[in-house]
């Protein structure tokens, strides 16, 4: 059953995420009268302009009791990541860490007010880890949705010169300053499913595929060599990979004016892809129902 608290956390989290990635306008007089000034809470374009802080055992006062997450990741004072670390010698350490994260959010279906929801208004990633293992998810995830991150992109495993544990791969692949901010800005979507909003974070293969596609579009200068194939297994997130690619292209000064055309070979997939795009991003979506429609849309100057 969906609880009111869960709705409040998710709606607030989505609002804050939108504020972070789309910036805000503040009325201010800089000598030429009061005007709306764009304020970047986070500078996504130049990561070094931000302040990054990792705090161990940070105590937070909750309504009924304090909580002390093992690690909180702050960017410009905002708690954007929470990591729970468990001993590998306890029973089911990964599940125990996830259960602890659920407790912090008051998501254990307990009548006790045992956590502090306000911490997760800002949260973008949650990690449970023990020894060399680690899994990541978002605030809407259940245990089965916590997944490993197996790629240190833009580095390859051979580039790093040593065999890395899954925990080290996740840290290298997700928590470099550039990748952390890139994931927050371009690889998170909020999608309605079965009457509730689900927050989704890209998987490592989607992140890599989008970056390689962007690199080819920008750096290959022979048009016929810009194409390629991204291979997915069934159920591995093809639609969301396309959404993430479209979002990242729209944020890139060199690619934002491109017109994107998505072709499908099945009516069901066509409907699914249209719904996914409509539900997860704010760009104009035109659904061509015939060849004539498609030709007319292509003739338009807009980058829809």
Regions found by a protein language model. Name each.
Residues 1-264, 268-284, 301-303:
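ATP-dependent helicase/translocase motor core
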Residues 267, 288-297:
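Conserved helicase motor
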